[in-house]
């Protein structure tokens, strides 16, 4: 029942944030729409940002599990590669696009996402360092973890920023630039 209540609250919150904007929806609004007490919302989520990132722990467990729970015949690098490819597939889903568009719309959510990534990086560094195939140096372990998490960020960036990139690439394309007298295209 607790997990179902938590999931219901998170789904309602995400819908409200997406429909009305993150900054325009309060915890009381979420509680009212989810038909629970405000104290129930806070019993499940420590902050408003945590409502959006309700899968934070699951994501970290999946990253660490990609290293710790891989099959004996799979190398450390191949396990991380497979996890990154799963992330790329997820980032191309409509749900992901909507989610990351919401995150990009709020400075508070971007900040929370950055802090979350730092926690995930530390957990992944620990998992990599304790692996038998771990690189010899702590710096190499950290670099491998950072590369993996940066690949996640890069996978999501084109999707959430596509409208901005499309607009800037159109305005900077040769066809959209004013022509100089005597240039080849004006001849």
Spell out what each predicted region is:
Residues 36-45:
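Short hydrophobic/aromatic patch on the recognition helix
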Residues 1-20, 24-36, 53, 62:
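Basic, helix-initiating cap at the start of DNA-binding domains
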Residues 126, 161-187:
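C-terminal peripheral helix-coil segments that are non-catalytic and often amphipathic
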Residues 5, 55, 59, 84, ...:
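Hydrophobic/aromatic residues within well-ordered alpha-helical segments
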Residues 107-133, 138-146:
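Amphipathic alpha-helical packing segments from all-alpha helical-bundle domains
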Residues 61-101:
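Hydrophobic alpha-helical connector segments
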Residues 49-51:
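A secondary-structure capping/hinge motif
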């Amino acid at each position: 029942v607790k997990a179902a209540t938590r999931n219901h609250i998170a789904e309602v919150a995400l819908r409200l944030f997406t429909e009305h904007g993150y900054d325009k929806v309060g915890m009381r609004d979420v509680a009212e729409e989810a038909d629970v007490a405000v104290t129930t919302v806070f019993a499940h989520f420590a902050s408003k940002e945590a409502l959006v990132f309700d899968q934070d722990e699951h994501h970290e467990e999946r990253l660490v599990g990609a290293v710790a729970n891989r099959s004996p015949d799979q190398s450390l690098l191949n396990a991380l590669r497979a996890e990154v490819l799963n992330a790329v597939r997820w980032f191309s889903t409509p749900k992901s696009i909507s989610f990351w568009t919401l995150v990009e719309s709020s400075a508070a959510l971007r900040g929370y996402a950055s802090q979350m990534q730092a926690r995930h990086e530390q957990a992944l560094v620990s998992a990599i360092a304790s692996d038998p195939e771990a690189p010899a140096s702590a710096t190499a372990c950290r670099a491998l973890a950072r590369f993996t998490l940066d690949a996640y960020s890069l996978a999501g960036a084109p999707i959430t920023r596509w409208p901005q990139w499309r607009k800037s690439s159109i305005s900077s394309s040769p066809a959209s630039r004013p022509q100089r007298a005597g240039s080849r295209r004006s001849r």
